[in-house]
Amino acid sequence: MSKDDVIEVEGTVVEPLPNAMFRVELDNGHKVLAHVSGKIRMNFIRILPGDRVTVELSPYDLTRGRIIYRHK
């Protein structure tokens, strides 16, 4: 799967889960399970409930995603 196949959507972090996982509510109302991307983890960017984030979803499984950006 190439980078062109991913779906980028924005959402709000609802709750933190163990192992750097988060429940994110997307703008369209769906809730997905998202983990933190490597660059966010390496730069020690903290993600808290209520933060606006950009989530990258795979077209094969729309219930899981990767948090790639935390909006300021």
UniProtKB/Swiss-Prot annotation:
It is found in: Cytoplasm. CDD domains: S1_IF1. One of the essential components for the initiation of protein synthesis. Stabilizes the binding of IF-2 and IF-3 on the 30S subunit to which N-formylmethionyl-tRNA(fMet) subsequently binds. Helps modulate mRNA selection, yielding the 30S pre-initiation complex (PIC). Upon addition of the 50S ribosomal subunit IF-1, IF-2 and IF-3 are released leaving the mature 70S translation initiation complex. Belongs to the IF-1 family. Keywords: Cytoplasm, Initiation factor, Protein biosynthesis, RNA-binding, rRNA-binding. It comes from Carboxydothermus hydrogenoformans (strain ATCC BAA-161 / DSM 6008 / Z-2901). One of its GO terms (molecular function) is rRNA binding. GO terms for cellular component: cytosol. This is Translation initiation factor IF-1. Residues 1-72 form the S1-like domain. SUPFAM superfamilies: Nucleic acid-binding proteins (SSF50249). Pfam families: eIF-1a. The lineage of its organism: Bacteria, Bacillati, Bacillota, Clostridia, Thermoanaerobacterales. SMART domains: S1. InterPro entries: NA-bd_OB-fold, RNA-binding_domain_S1_IF1, S1_domain, TIF_IF1. It comes from the Bacteria. Component of the 30S ribosomal translation pre-initiation complex which assembles on the 30S ribosome in the order IF-2 and IF-3, IF-1 and N-formylmethionyl-tRNA(fMet); mRNA recruitment can occur at any time during PIC assembly. Its main location: cytoplasm.
